[in-house]
Amino acid sequence: MRVTLRMVIFFLSLCAATPATAKPLHHFVFFGQDREKLQTTKSFLETKAFEGAQVAYMWRQLEPGKDEYDFSMIREDLAFLSQHGKKLWVQLQDVTFSERWVPVPRYLTRDPQYHGGANRQYQYKADDEEHAAAAGWAARRWDPAVQDRFHKLLAAMAKEFDGKIEGINFAESSVTFGSTGKLYPEGFTPEVYRDALVTNLKALKRAFSKSIVVQYANFMPGEWRPSDDRGYLRAVFKTAKETKAGVGGPDLLPYQRGHMGNSYELIKELAGEVTVAIAVQDGNYAHINPKTGKRVTIAELIAFASDYLKADYIFWCTEEPYYSNDLVGFMRK
């Protein structure tokens, strides 16, 4: 009986210690092109588990003219969220996935010194780059002239919002310019691009010393980890570790082979040293969990983010019917 009692006491002590030692997981709801829903989505505003909103703002929206900054949308969202006891997280969008949307200011596309400001991204089947179709735009992150303008934007944003917003993240590191070099834009190489991401992340961290800084780093052009690891993605994570910038990515896909081999391993390595933020984006709710052969559940998404990636933040998209039918009910339990 004495042994049994000791076992019970030991078990209870473990249970009591867990809540105090477990790392809290913060839940935000993501609003992108549906930003206007921020103020009308009652399920978001009335669910306490949702601590705030991650809102995507395009560079083009924030700088309508050279050195003419318009942060009115950020101010409006910050004020509205504050009134409702919630926080704002900014996603700075300099890439798009539609031919219709060019993410950079118009002056960058017209002044020759910026070489167009942005370049087309492409999609194609297998390795058929000859028949590639346009699939959006990416700012010329590696172009010194464009980079200089981008850093000025960061400084202007930080001057007004550092310490007021919960955090800010860059869009994903992945760009789709093919793998053979035939579709590479002017001045682009995987090595130059790697160095540009490192430089931009350092600039973001210098600008924002109070709010959390995160680089979405999922894939890098010119390599495919782990079979063809050139050190490009690892260099970005190394910089994050050195500067204490956070890391994360735009897709939460438990046990998906491509992500497991590329970014997830590196994210897990830095967990506990820097902030980890992961996003559930369109299509993620319908992911088939390789462990079960069934569509992933909200509980499984959270468990993978918390237990494997050791995430601090999850950003949930509002894709229907999953957001209303699955996520909101789960968060209100």
Which residues does each PLM region occupy?
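Bacterial N-terminal signal peptides
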Residues: 6-16
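Aromatic-lined substrate-binding rim segments of carbohydrate-active enzymes
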Residues: 40-50, 54-123, 158-160, 186-203, ...
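Aromatic-lined carbohydrate-recognition surfaces of secreted/lumenal glycan-active proteins
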Residues: 25-33, 165-175, 197-227, 246-255
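Catalytic domains of carbohydrate-active enzymes, especially glycoside hydrolases
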Residues: 33-60, 87-91, 238-248, 270, ...
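Substrate-binding cleft of secreted/luminal carbohydrate-active enzymes
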Residues: 89, 93, 242-333
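Boundary at the C-terminal end of the N-terminal hydrophobic targeting segment
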Residues: 19-22
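Well-ordered, non-membrane alpha-helical segments in soluble/globular domains
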Residues: 36-40, 68-77, 146-155, 190-202, ...
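An active-site-proximal structural segment forming one wall of the substrate-binding cleft
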Residues: 80-82, 114, 127-170, 196, ...
